[in-house]
């Protein structure tokens, strides 16, 4: 089968991502049971527009945002040209759905999702992923999130998750803090079926080495469309069980303060390192929608140190470092012994 996009590629991906936005919003409203999303449609002067949906002050979610955008233009931003110089001089099209959820309860993790598609002349690619940021560590929650996304990837090809999991660890990393933003998930970018799966620049990374071992997979446009469809569809099953398990856990003022402190790391990553934020600002995107990912409240504290042996300590030392969450028996034993397994 041809690797070229079908003639209706733009319409097809747009409809997939609109449906993803709808399904997630309906699911989250059912889960929250109190608040509803408000929608704001917007137009971009240079071409295109989108629909931003935000839920505030719910029973579970302090703030939840689910954005859809479909934008096009003539001049490509430098961030794209530097990665794919052959796209220069072509009109471009980009569509995506992104989501960030900030729950009130510190025992329910923040979660992020983004699936996107890009075309410019002969150049096209899919990108996407989902990642989880707990504030209090529970290994079973982490495992459920990874399991659902692993299964979604393996429906397309059994080797994809072997690269996308470590690529996520690599991408969502705060270099200035030397720690991960959370416990990862999956991440992929610039997927057009050509070459090796890993398109990053770090030849020392686990994702790069796994990609070398696997070789070329020869995926086509339809395979990659199915990947976005499967992974987007896996989100609610990966996250809803965590909410149901944690929503009635009582928390202290100190635990809420720690959640806000760790949210500060989320802000730092999104404003300093995130390519999506940079792309949006470089292409004159809608600032309110681009910065929707930021939490409504966060805090910073100079020189904070968690008490040794506390849950906050385990979060900082173990759950902000890449791990083999599914298979590491030593990690499992440690979590069980220290009441951070389930």
Curated annotation (Swiss-Prot):
For the site labelled Important for dimerization, the residues are 176
Q: Which family does it belong to?
A: Belongs to the aerobic coproporphyrinogen-III oxidase family.
Catalyses: coproporphyrinogen III + O2 + 2 H(+) = protoporphyrinogen IX + 2 CO2 + 2 H2O
GO CC entries: cytoplasm
State the needed cofactors, names only: a divalent metal cation
Official protein name in the record: Oxygen-dependent coproporphyrinogen-III oxidase
- Provenance organism: Prochlorococcus marinus subsp. pastoris (strain CCMP1986 / NIES-2087 / MED4)
According to the record's subunit comment, the protein's assembly and interactions are: Homodimer.
Give the EC number: 1.3.3.3
Q: Name the major location.
A: cytoplasm
Record-annotated residues binding substrate?
Answer: 98, 114-116
Under Gene3D superfamilies, the record lists: Coproporphyrinogen III oxidase, aerobic
Q: Which residues form the signal peptide?
A: none
Q: Does the keyword Lipid biosynthesis apply?
A: no
Instruction: Give the protein's biological function.
Output: Involved in the heme and chlorophyll biosynthesis. Catalyzes the aerobic oxidative decarboxylation of propionate groups of rings A and B of coproporphyrinogen-III to yield the vinyl groups in protoporphyrinogen-IX.
């Amino acid at each position: 089968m041809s690797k070229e996009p079908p003639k209706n590629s733009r319409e097809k991906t747009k409809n997939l991502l609109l449906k993803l936005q709808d399904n997630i919003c309906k699911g989250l409203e059912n889960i929250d049971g109190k608040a509803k999303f408000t929608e704001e449609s917007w137009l971009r002067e240079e071409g295109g527009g989108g629909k931003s949906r935000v839920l505030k002050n719910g029973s579970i979610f302090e703030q939840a945002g689910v954005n859809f955008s479909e934008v096009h233009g003539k001049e490509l931003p430098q961030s794209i040209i530097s990665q794919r110089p052959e796209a220069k001089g072509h009109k471009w099209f980009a569509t995506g759905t992104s989501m960030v959820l900030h729950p009130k309860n510190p025992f329910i993790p923040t979660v992020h999702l983004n699936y996107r598609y890009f075309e410019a002349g002969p150049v096209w690619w899919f990108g996407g992923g989902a990642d989880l940021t707990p504030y209090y560590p529970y290994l079973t929650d982490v495992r459920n999130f990874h399991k659902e996304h692993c299964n979604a990837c393996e429906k397309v090809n059994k080797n994809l998750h072997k690269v996308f999991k470590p690529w996520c660890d690599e991408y969502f990393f705060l270099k200035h803090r030397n720690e991960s933003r959370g416990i990862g998930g999956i991440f992929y970018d610039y997927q057009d079926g050509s070459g090796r799966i890993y398109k990053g620049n770090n030849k020392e990374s686990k994702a790069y080495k796994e990609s070398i071992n696997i070789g070329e997979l020869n995926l086509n446009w339809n395979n990659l469309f199915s990947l976005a469809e499967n992974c987007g569809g896996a989100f609610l099953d990966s996250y809803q069980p965590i909410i149901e398990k944690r929503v009635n856990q009582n928390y202290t003022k100190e635990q809420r303060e720690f959640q806000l402190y760790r949210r500060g790391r989320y802000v730092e990553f999104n404003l300093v390192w995130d390519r999506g934020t940079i792309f949006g600002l470089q292409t004159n995107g809608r600032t309110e929608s681009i910065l929707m990912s930021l939490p409504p409240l966060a805090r910073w504290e100079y020189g904070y140190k968690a008490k040794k042996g506390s849950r906050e300590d385990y979060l900082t030392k173990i759950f902000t470092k890449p791990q083999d969450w599914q298979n590491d028996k030593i990690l499992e034993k440690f979590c069980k012994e220290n009441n951070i397994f389930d």
